[in-house]
Amino acid sequence: MVAARARLDIATSNLANVSTDGFRKLTARGALTPNGARVGAERSNRRGEIRRTGREYDLAIVGPGHFSVRDAAGRVVDTRSGSFERTLRGTLADARGRTLLGDAGPLIVPQDATIDERGRVLAGDNDTHRAIPLPRDSTLRAGFLEESPVDPIAEMVGIVDASRSFETAQKVVGAIDSLRQKNASDIARVR
């Protein structure tokens, strides 16, 4: 039942994030231990398609890597979602207000600057030496976002399958309880 419940939770999470840019699908992984079944989630490395948005501060990483953003409490979080807006202070922030970090703290983007495929901020003909850190084999596409690679049909099938497994496990547990009660009453009658 634990495994079926975990598969159900993971499939519903994947389905809920089918439209979340940069989301990476979760997969259930389990193991039998002396103390019972252990189930966890593993994040997929499969990337989604790159979609043109035309918005200059939408950024997609092609290849491995992530964006680092800092929230108001100072926590740094890694994300693949590259939907950013330029703030009045010249930083880039996501919809939650988290600030995009460059290689030297918050990334400052001058008004008419662009961001190139290596993540460098270019103002006019000058490289401002501010950059979004990227692995060597990755590039950045400004005006694009990475879509979620989740297949909604496959996740719905997974939800139905996990629900059926859960229901079957519940019936088995109910049958075992009934047998225990019957055996206990049979033993009591014999005495």
Predicted stretch roles:
Residues 1-191:
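Amphipathic alpha-helical polymerization modules
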